[in-house]
Amino acid sequence: MSRKHFLTTVLFLLTTCLLQAQETERQYLSGTGLDNTVTWQFRVSEGRNSGRWSKIEVPSQWELQGFGEYTYGRWYKKPGIKNPSMEEGTYKRSFRIPRNWQGRNIRLWLDGVMTDTEVFVNGQSAGPVHQGGFYRFSYDVTDLLKYGSSNQIEVRVKKHSDNRTVNAAERKADWWLFGGIYRPVWLEAKPAVHIERLAVDARADGELKVEVHLQGVTGEESLSMEVSPVSAKDAEHRPVKVTADSVQLLTAHFDGISPWTPESPTLYRLTVSLLGKAGNVIHSMNTRIGF
């Protein structure tokens, strides 16, 4: 098959309506930022307004919502002070998810919680305790959810970690200590066979490598990628047949791209599609990239 014929076929398959039908669906359980929050039930163990159930806005720092204790991060330099701000907070809320999500893969994402975090869905543990407050983490909650009916999430947070190295890196610093769910929380629904994540290496000469992490593939699928606004005639690309391995590598070269610079920060949209045996789009994922 010629390059031009292949790219024409790919562009036909990647029509807008088809992409919308197969893209990841997201449902927020919190707000999306400090100016857009959602109310959860909350109880803190020590400090202000402790020992009773109340309400808190999520995402936020619980100190700024009137809970717990303010402590300056260099407390360890002062004699006689040992491990202040040892509060533990518990968050709860109910939520519903669509019935048509049944049969899909559902992951619960927490974008940032300070510091140790344990999550329960409908009374069952979602997975191991997460330690560290500066990066997102997730759990596969597919089998824990009730589809089309009410669910409950409970998040237990320790302001100080049980891990001494985490405390040394995050708690003993020149800042005010804080605790809580301070970044968004959401659910992601994907097909059972899907793209889990992408690792992108884009070079200034137009060379592009994409490591595609897959879940549930059988070896009958294939992968395709598209970069916009790069036109089809400027693209050099071939289809990649998927093996049963969960990690696949896509490579391509794009002529005529505008490299990213501080003066001209040009961005492109990369779309990677997982195709079925008949050429149908099973799932697609897109992200912004710069060369």
Model-derived features with residue positions:
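Accessory carbohydrate-binding/adhesion or oligomerization-edge regions at the termini
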Residues: A21-R74, R156, H160-T165, V230, ...
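Short, aromatic- and glycine-rich surface loops/edge beta-strands on solvent-exposed regions
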Residues: Q152-V155, S264-G276
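Short glycine/proline/serine/threonine-rich loop/turn segments at secondary-structure transition edges
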Residues: W101-R104, L145-S150, H253-L267
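Beta-strand-rich binding/interaction modules
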Residues: V121, E207-V242, Q248-L250, L270-V272
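Bacterial N-terminal signal peptides that target proteins for export
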Residues: M1-V10
